[in-house]
Structure formats: C-alpha cells, structure tokens
Amino acid sequence: MHRFLQILILYTLSSSLFSQNVDFERPEGWAMAFTTASSLNLGQSTPQKISPGELILSAELSSIPSLSKEQQKVGFNGLKDEDLNKSPIFGRIRISYGLPWDTTAEISWTPPFEIDGAKPENLWGFAFSRPFIQLEKIGLGIRIFMTRGDVKADVTCSEEMVAIEPYTPGNLSGCIGISRDVLTVDHHGLEAALTFNTLGKKITPWLAVALTRMEPSVRVDAPLQYGQEIVDIYSQGTTQTLSIGISYDFNERNVLNLSTSYTPLDVIRPVSLGDRDSFWNFKLGYSFSF
C-alpha cells in the first residue's frame, strides 16, 4: 500500500497542468504588466497629417530596465525567484500609410531575434491616428493602438538555475532543464498627444498620455525533477503612461525621434520595496517617408 501511494504521488507530480487568474497587483501580475509595458505600442511621435497614399517607414529601439534580485521574487505570490532580466532592449519596425480625412494607418512588427534567452514571436501591432487640432503654436492628435503576440523566455528555469543542484538555494523549484515559458503581451489603448511648435521648424517637442488595457498571460512549461510543470497564469488591468519626446526633422523625409515613457505600476509584495516597481524607459526612433 505504501509503495502504491508513492507511485500515485509521483504520477500526479509528473504532469501538473492548471490555470489561474491573478490580481494585477500580485507579484505575478505585476511581472506580466512590467514585461507588457516594455512592448507598449505607443506613438513614436505625435499624429501627423500625411497625404493619402504616402508611405512612412520607421524603426525604433527602446530600453528595458533591469530588475533587482528582490524585484524578481514573483513566483508563488512573491516567494520564488524568477529570471526576469532578459533582453535589455526592445525594437520594432513600423509602416505608416496615409488615408483620407487626415487619418494614418499603421502596422508594426518586432523581428524574432533572441537576446539573453528571450525571443519575440508573431508580435504585431496596429494603430490608427489623426491630428484633430493644428494651431500655430500647438497641436493635438489622437491615436488608437493594439498589440498581439508572444515572447518566449526561460524565466522559470534559466540556464544559470539549471546548473545548480535541485532543491537547493538558487534552484528551489527543482529545475533540471531550461523552461520554455511563453508570455503573451496583448494590449490595446488610446493615446492623446500635444505638439508644441515653439522651437522652430526642425525641432518639435511633444507630450503624450496613454490609457492602456493590458491582458497578459504566461504559460509556464518547466522540466522539474519530479515532473513537468505546466501552468497557465492570466491577469488583466489598466495602466496610464506619460511620454515626453522631441522630434528633429533633418529634412522633409528624414525625422529623428527621442522620447522617454513612464508607466506607474503597483505591486503588493510580502516585503515592500518602496516606489521602484514602475516602468520607465527611453526610446530612439528614425522615420523615412517615401
């Protein structure tokens, strides 16, 4: 009988599959929101009036802040270490197309380059934008946006963790192989941007505020010593993002954009870390119109 119970327990542990929905402010929910914030499909500059049929090709590169060891304790409601410091940058390519009524349609794509164990997969963005007010010194534009796609990363069982003996400090989960975790960074939102035409024709400062509905999820797929852990975790929440930037027009076709964005994020941890959990990054963009 004792032997039967041992076999039954091991069989149960060999393939654990379940799903859970966590609060947006739980450590797991915060980690998903933080990663999603790094991929926000915000405007590279403010909505511009372009002619119907005009095409603009642009590329952007943004920073991803590094997290402390304490911030990476997000598993099991903030008790387990995860490897969240992956790629330090995020990039995308955009194509904008002029439509009638001063409207611009936009599609963006993140190339599937793997950096430090993280690889975007089928990460696409879509947006429509339009300037609504254009005065001599100030302008107002509105943009609606969305992103759909995944990022694969070895968060639960990283290469460094697997090198440590299972169930010892540094590998408390018992990882025996690199995990194949998949984070979905789906989101959609609305962005309003103000343009200030006060520094001449070449330099244009701008300010934008975005309201984003995030619907991230993660599938944990980790090989542990006593079985394969497969867990689906979901969360939902709304965030606000403040962006400040400046655009420099080299000429009518070439524009350089510099900006920074701040997304306040709250998290309830077993031990408070103060106000260090919000997302703040910097972005560099370049546009060429045909």
Located regions from the model:
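Transmembrane beta-strands of outer-membrane beta-barrel proteins
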Residues: 58-62, 106-110, 140-147, 206-210, ...
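N-terminal signal peptide c-region/cleavage motif recognized by signal peptidases
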Residues: 13-17
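Outer-membrane beta-barrel transmembrane domain signature
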Residues: 20-34, 63-74, 157-254, 262-268, ...
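Outer-membrane beta-barrel "beta-signal"
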Residues: 277-290
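Membrane-embedded beta-strands of outer-membrane beta-barrel proteins
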Residues: 93-95, 126-128, 190-194, 242-244, ...
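Transmembrane beta-barrel domains of Gram-negative outer membranes and organellar outer membranes
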Residues: 20-135, 147-149
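Transmembrane beta-barrel outer-membrane domains
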Residues: 84-90, 117-123, 181-187, 233-239, ...
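Repeated loop/turn-to-beta-strand initiation elements of outer-membrane beta-barrel proteins
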Residues: 102-107, 135-140, 202-205, 252-258
